[in-house]
Amino acid sequence: MKIIYESEIKKILSDLDPLSFIRDGFIAYSAGKCVVPPVGELSFKNPPGDVHIKYGYIEGDDFYVIKIASGFFKNMDIGISNGQGMMLLFRQKTGECEAILLDNAYLTDVRTAIAGAICAKEFSN
């Protein structure tokens, strides 16, 4: 099992075409090939914050992913980012953990930006 930190994730992404991966994921989802259960959520009052747990897989793929993303809105008061997160990558056939991606919500930001670009392109046609 590998632990991959945000700085390494950024280097790896610079050599890939994440737009095509996200687009292919949308196509697989629209074709009914994705298993995406409802989002799990933990809410906190003091300090105010929440944690979302998302998970899923594409049928026939090699992996499934569990994403844990949190937002604690007073973190900036203590000098840390409001958003935290990681993704856990497992093999579909064995359940073995292949990698922990300590991305600090970076991959979520990239995915959101790319999804917006794809939608803008498709709706402008």
Language-model features, listed with the residues they occupy:
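N-terminal ligand-binding/catalytic initiation module
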Residues: 1-108, 115-117
